[in-house]
From Swiss-Prot:
This protein's name: Protein FdhE homolog
Domain of life: Bacteria
GO annotation (BP), single: protein maturation
Organism: Cupriavidus necator (strain ATCC 17699 / DSM 428 / KCTC 22496 / NCIMB 10442 / H16 / Stanier 337)
Membrane-crossing segments per the record: none
UniProt family annotation: Belongs to the FdhE family.
Length: 287
């Protein structure tokens, strides 16, 4: 694994003074479709090819369900389970996946379909409260996919929150941790945005400082490739946390959830160095 320290050049010289949008909410159907395409591309020759393709299929179904989501509910993570709208999305998700998943996955979808309403609610509450180990790993990603679609849809229908000048370690819309941070291209060339694991919002944070504690004095960037790798782990020697940085400058088709999921081996290596991940992936929930 390669390691290099942050330098002043890592931070674009004009980022602090440039006009920028503090919060971005990408079009959901387009986002899910791009994610699915990226997952399928990354699956080629990958050790986790079957799982990456399953995640791609889930993203495709999410894209097909965007128009069916109820946008009237709250976008707060802990309020979503009680609203109940996500349950109908879960049923449709299971129905559309049932005949198009690997054989070992089918029994888990059937068990999830048969789960009583109170058990579903309890599992959803556990996930949105961060008690991931309370939900079987075989069904958690499907539950999360429905919860995420509902929360993301509600977030796009609600007024954009005024998060103030402070930069946030967690999503200013729903309060959930990020999947990773993205270095963007185009009008926001070189700017960093964190991508929410639940509502799919993206919020700005300047580069070359820890996304968890805000310190800039002890940052290292770890990767299996060179310092110019598309996916690197930004690790902090102050709080001992880390979060991946995914550069669209280096690979424009890169996508937060897809590229993070395809680089879980990097998580294992960074964790072995004594760092703790400060975010999570919807298809690889902690616990």
């Amino acid at each position: 694994m390669n390691q290099h320290q942050a330098t002043p050049g890592t931070l674009p010289s004009d980022e602090a003074s440039r006009h920028f949008t503090p919060l971005i909410q990408p079009d959901l159907a387009g986002l899910y479709s791009r994610r699915a395409a990226r997952l399928r591309a990354l699956a080629e020759g990958h050790d986790l090819a079957d799982y990456l393709r399953l995640a791609a299929r889930v993203a495709e179904v999410q894209a097909s369900l965007v128009a069916e989501a109820d946008v009237s509910g709250p976008a707060d993570a802990r309020a979503i389970p009680q609203e109940g709208h996500w349950g109908a999305l879960l049923d449709r998700l299971i129905e559309r996946l049932a005949h198009d998943v690997p054989a070992p996955v089918a029994p888990h979808l059937a068990a999830l379909r048969a789960l009583p309403a109170d058990a579903r609610l309890g599992a959803a509450q556990a996930l949105t409260e961060g008690r991931f180990d309370a939900v079987p790993a075989a069904i958690a990603p499907f539950l999360w996919a429905a919860l995420s679609l509902q929360c993301a849809s509600a977030a796009r229908a609600a007024p954009v929150p005024d998060s103030g000048p402070a930069e946030h370690a967690s999503c200013p819309v729903c309060g959930t941790a990020p999947v990773a941070s993205l270095i963007l291209i185009g009008d926001r060339q070189g700017m960093r945005y964190l991508h929410c694991a639940l509502c799919e919002s993206q919020w700005h944070m300047v580069r070359a400082k820890c996304t968890n504690c805000g310190e800039a004095s002890e940052l290292d960037y770890l990767s299996f490739d060179t310092a110019e790798a598309t996916v690197r782990a930004e690790s902090c020697g102050v709080c001992h946390g880390y979060l991946k940085v995914i550069s669209l400058e280096r690979d424009p088709p890169a996508e937060a959830v897809a590229d993070d999921l395809a680089s879980l081996a990097l998580d294992d290596a960074v964790t072995a160095e004594g760092y703790q991940r400060t975010g999570f992936n919807p298809f690889a929930l902690p616990g």
